């Protein structure tokens, strides 16, 4: 094959592929890579939207760690929110998946109904609906009154507000549930048959067979839900605006306020990179510890 033939072949096929990929590549460079790198530069600058960035070194980070108590509170709230929602969502998703892993009449409709909340994700509409339901004169307190039970300040009590936000997140377990359900379908039936012959109980089969077989999916859901929880913003912003008394003031809220209320874009960029580093560190820890409990193939 001559050099000319190679060039002709490359031009016809590979350039066509590049042409199809070009919109995605351009979009990634403009909408993702450029903001990602520019935020890193701005995090070392004193930069307001209407002004010109001026390099200040590590001053934004020093201020965050040594002089900004609000930052430490928001970090604490974010980690607490993550510790509540991630295990809660995974346990709920797995429990429902086990319940739905059966062949009965209408099971597809039931699975769809359980999945519907996740279609809306962390949308503003869902957050507004949740706020209306849990306000002092909302639907939930009306039900409690009907049952002659005391009303609860779901959104007004600093000790309760974060739990209410967490309940909304756990309620949207559908995406994890679908993945768990697919994993359960792939567990070999002969393992259960052998265990049943040996006289193993349902509980023992679940923890000795089911859980080890689906640990890769548990790990995947754990990573994805942890990242999502650490980036939470919509529910805290729409439902409580970070209150009461900063009880739901997550890092996403802190970033938003600094950047778009106080227009301190350099400071907000530093916060965004702290969020990125926290996510990266927690993810690395999860990957490092996975070798002790995640089983692939015949390892289980």
Identify the function of each model-found stretch.
Residues 4, 8-300:
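A structural signal for multi-pass alpha-helical bundles of membrane permease subunits
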């Amino acid at each position: 094959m001559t050099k000319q033939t190679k060039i002709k072949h490359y031009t016809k096929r590979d350039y066509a592929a590049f042409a199809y990929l070009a919109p995605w590549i351009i979009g990634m460079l403009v909408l993702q890579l450029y903001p990602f790198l520019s935020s890193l530069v701005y995090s070392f600058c004193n930069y307001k939207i209407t002004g010109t960035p001026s390099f200040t070194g590590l001053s934004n980070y020093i201020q965050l760690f040594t002089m900004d108590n609000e930052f430490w509170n928001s970090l604490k709230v974010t980690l607490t929110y993550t510790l509540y929602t991630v295990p809660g969502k995974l346990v709920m998703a797995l429990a429902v998946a086990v319940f739905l892993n059966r062949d009965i009449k209408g099971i597809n409709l039931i699975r769809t109904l359980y999945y519907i909340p996740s279609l809306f994700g962390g949308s503003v509409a869902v957050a507004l609906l949740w706020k209306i339901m849990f306000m002092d004169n909302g639907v939930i307190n009306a039900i409690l009154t009907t049952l002659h039970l005391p009303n609860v300040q779901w959104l007004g009590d600093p000790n309760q507000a974060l739990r209410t936000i967490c309940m909304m997140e756990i309620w949207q377990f559908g995406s994890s549930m679908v993945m768990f359900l697919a994993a359960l379908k792939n567990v070999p039936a002969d393992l259960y048959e052998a265990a049943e012959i040996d006289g193993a109980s349902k509980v023992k089969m679940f923890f000795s067979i089911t859980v080890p077989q689906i640990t890769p999916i548990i790990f995947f859901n754990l990573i994805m839900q942890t990242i999502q929880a650490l980036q939470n913003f919509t529910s805290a912003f729409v439902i409580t605006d970070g209150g009461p008394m900063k009880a739901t003031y997550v890092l996403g809220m802190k970033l938003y306020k600094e950047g778009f209320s106080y227009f301190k874009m350099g400071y907000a960029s530093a916060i965004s990179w702290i969020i990125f580093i926290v996510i990266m560190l927690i993810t690395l820890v999860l990957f490092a510890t996975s070798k002790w409990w995640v089983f692939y193939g015949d390892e289980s």
